[in-house]
Amino acid sequence: MVACSSKKKRVEKVEAPEEPDSTIMVQLQKVTDDSITFLQIDTKRTRTLGYADARRSNSVHGTLAVGDTLAVVPMFKQKLALSVVNVSELTGLWMFEGNSGTGMRLNADGAACDVGPSEVTLREWKLRNGHFILVYVPADGSDYNEKSDTSTIISLDKDHFSYTLNGNEKRCSKVKGLITK
C-alpha cells in the first residue's frame, strides 16, 4: 500500500518590522551655540543634548526659540540630538507659492487638510525618526486606501516651509490672521 500527501504550505507575507519611533516632543527651555535644554513633555524631565552635528547635517529645521515645541530624535547615551524640528513653526495654515489659492493646514494634533483643489486629500501628518510624513488619499476618488509619503523637509522657519511630496518640491508661506495662529 502506498500513501501520499499533498500538504500545501501556506505562504505568509512577511513584512519587515517597522523601526520604533524614537521621536520625543519637548518644550525648549534654553539654547546655546551647540546645545539645547528642554522639558520632555511626556516625562516632565529636563534634559540637555548637543545639536551641533545635527545642524551640520541639515537636520535642524526651524528656529530654536525658547518656549516652542520641538520634535527631537535623541541619542541619550551620547547626549546628542540627531534631528530637531520646530513643531510650533510647522503647525498652522500654509499656502503654496504661485498665488493658486491652494495650501494645507497642519494641526498640532497631527490632523492635516487641504485648502483648495489638490491632487491629494491630506489626512494626517507626523514626524517619525526625524522624517516628515504626510498621509493622504488621491483626490480623484480612484483609491480610498491611505498612502503615506516620507517627505524631506528642505527648509522651515516661522514664515516659510519647503518640503518634498512624492519627489516634488512644495514651497509654502504661512498665513496669519483672524482665523489662524
Predicted features, each with a name:
Residues 6-25, 31-122, 133-181:
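Lipid interaction determinants
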